Amino acid sequence: MAVIIPRSDPPSRIHPEPPQTLEIDHFDHLPDSILLLVFNKIGDVKALGRCCVVSRRFHSLVPQVDNVVVRVDCVISDDDSSSLSSIKSRSGSSAGSFSAIFRLVVGGIVKPLQALGQFLGTKRSSSSCGGSGSSSSSLSISGDDDGGEIEQGGVTHHSPTQVLKNFDEIRYLRIELPSGELGIDDGVLLKWRAEFGSTLDNCVILGASSVIPPNPMRVSQACDTTTVVEAPGSGSDDNGSIPESFYTNGGLKLRVVWTISSLIAASARHYLLQPIIAEHKTLDSLVLTDSDGQGVLCMNRDQLEELRVKPLAASSASKRTLVPALNMRLWYAPTLELPDGTVLKGATLVAIRPSESKKEVSDISWVSSAFEEPYETAAKMLVKRRTYCLEMNSF
């Protein structure tokens, strides 16, 4: 006779597992205002792009960020023969007297400026917020792209115009280039800071033929005193006069090259920022600088609005803003020793304003405050010396 053994229920039925509880996302308890505060502290456009892909909520909040920093990893330019020939053909038809001077005096910076122009191209594409901010570690562009991006070595590069396209409420924008446009020799100091509206408002240039770092022994001794002793040739004993050798050994010519080069670099940056300024009408401040600290272009809210309202005077042949006729003031010291022991050889400070500027000529506070330390101190020391006035025609 067969014996039937009753089948027992599975253990899961005898001891059922407790229902799984959903993990709590604590970010859901944070109000949007707090998250936006965090995103504004982050600032970096590529990091914000990565935040976009975390959640739908983050994706919807990132476009509302008002403080954005674009750090450019590389500047890509087409160096093949076809690109070079096309550049030559375009520039050849518009070559004029200034073009000849430009090539003669500052030919060394033509190629970097062309690369900057290609980097800040105005092509547009319909990409998402997440894609535009995080799909590449390099933000760059060549001149002949379609859609504001280019592939190089399997990496997609984007233009700032494309990257910033989906940010709706930017108030403070900072773009940092990987290096300055002006190729200078090792040991040479060249810094500039320019402000623009629809054209140049002012520019300050600080240069030195060489920089001698502080001697530790002299610095320690200086800390024990309450006075700063200027190096020979930098004090008031010579009344700040420029020595005759400055005119005969090429010193003046070199300063002219520094000035023209800096103005061209500044006006090229300004010209290439137009698409971003036109699109982002909420901007209160725009800064275009470089990681070398060589040049800084600044625009405040009034200056940004002026550019939108007034037509831009542009030099289309060289892709830059037309520089107006200028009044310049120059200060020079053969040797300038700073309080920290740094010595500047051939220290030169140039303050530039348009000839038609209605601002008070005697006010030079904007000159001495143009740079960060230790160069702010250098500027303050130089403006106490004899002033030399120069003029420059529009170019």
Swiss-Prot record:
Residues 122-158 are annotated as: Disordered. Residues 24-72 form the F-box domain. GO terms for biological process: heat acclimation. Residues 125-142 have a biased composition (Low complexity). It holds the Pfam family F-box-like. Transmembrane segments: none annotated. Gene3D superfamilies: 1.20.1280.50. This is F-box protein At5g46170. The lineage of its organism: Eukaryota, Viridiplantae, Streptophyta, Embryophyta, Tracheophyta.
